[in-house]
Structures are given as C-alpha cells and as structure tokens.
C-alpha cells in the first residue's frame, strides 16, 4: 500500500508540546545532559502547579544522586491534559511528552491506548513521538492504532568511541526497529550528535531527519559535535532519499566561534554556519511540509478540525 500523508497544502500549523506524561530515566549516552531533568526540577518549585493539583507531581520526578540532580525513574500521568488536543481547533504540530519517553516501562499499555485514542480522533493535528526505547516501541506497535497524523521517530546520538558494546547495539537497533514500524511517517533525531554515524547505517524507509549539536547552560559540559559527523550524516540521508534538516550546531560550537556572547548559546543562528550547511537549516517543524516530503509520501486530504532557511529551530531535542 502506498504511504499516505494527511496534510492539506493550505493548512498553516503552529507548534505545541503535549506533556501528558512526565518523568523518565536514562538509557544511553544521549541522556547524559537531558534538558528534562532541570526542567522537571524547575517545575517542582512552581506554586501554580501545587495550587492546581493540591500537591506538585513534579516533586517526585527528580532526586539528588551522588551529588547531582537526576531522574528518579518515577512518572506522572496528567489525566486532565489528555483531552487538550481535542479542544484545540487550529491545526497544530504536537511534540508528545518532551519531558518523558512515550515507551518508558512506567507508561502502561492502558495509558498508551488512551493517548493514542486522542491522537486518532484529533486527525487535524500532527503528533510527533520521539523515543530512545525502540524495543518497547516495536513490542507495542501492533497493539496501537496508527492513523496517518501520527509520526514516529527515534533518537540516534551517534556512536561515541567510548560507548560500551551493549549500549552500542541498543542504539543501532533503534534504526532497524523504526524501519519496520507501521507509522505513516518516520523520522530520526540525530541530536545530540555526540559521535560518528556508521556509514553503513540503513535509513531505508525513513522520511526525514534532523541534526543538532548538544546544548547546555554550561560551556564545559556540552559535548562537541564534529562537523564531519554532520556532513556524513547529511550525505547518508540524501543517499536514501531521507530529507535532512539541521537544527543547531551546539553550545561547544557557539562557544568556540564566539557566538555564545551574542546569546546564541546552542548554535541555532545559521548566519555564521559553514556555507555548505546553511541550506539545511530549519526554522521550525512547520517547515517540514508536504512539498518537502512529496517525493516520498503521497498525500490525500484528511481530517479538518471540527467547527466551533537560516535561523532558529524549535524542534524537540533528543
């Protein structure tokens, strides 16, 4: 069957995050500087959340371990947020669970089915799901309903030289699991790109990918992205007909080039980028349009809401 796209060309989408589940735990090197940890810690001190829920659900999501703040491996399901996309009539690109992982073992199949039911019904929206837990993604794929408006992605942070063999195999397996996945549109996040991308990585059937260097509030803690890793990744994508985008060059690059001083702490401003990378810069997810994907994806018109290249990217990280 021909793959189907759900977008109408005339739609103008906005972007939102739908954090119906929050909380996580580390699975690979790409998690080491995860922005969700300080964000959950920040939210735990928000009095408005405490006032609304009686207690602050974020309080239990992080803990101090070996003198550092880390995930506690506990999760929280915000049932009151479940219907949010159904109440939003304007077509929106929703990044699902930016402070968690949809396929974390703490997210029950029952909760997953309820989340998918909302996404299935809200077919005037796009839902981007990004995971590092491709094994559970694969295990549950036939137990969930994959309407064309649900895009599935995996994170591939590259293969650092010091990555243990067991972790290396798991990271590589994410791509093979995604290739076989039934989602209508499939994508890869090469962010944070902290190691080389194997030249024999098979991206058959992957529709698009975005690349990004690691961002961090502290210059010395941000791991650098080698420009050659990025160039090799772009060339690999193009060889498979996978549309590549570049989100940012990372904090280490911004510091090395002096852009840190100009508040571009993640290397998102593409004006000072190497010239060959500028054409791949993405301003936002809204730029990933049917026109971009048309060579790969056929596109009938689907749901409407019920009545009642150089710059800064707002794509999800890692």
Language model feature labels by segment:
Residues 1-93, 101, 302:
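N-terminal [4Fe-4S]-dependent radical SAM core
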Residues 1-19, 43-46, 50, 170, ...:
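Auxiliary Fe-S-binding modules of radical SAM enzymes
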Residues 34, 40, 47-50, 110-112, ...:
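Generic preference for flexible, low-structure residues
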Residues 76-247, 254-255:
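Conserved AdoMet/S-adenosylmethionine-binding subsite of the radical SAM
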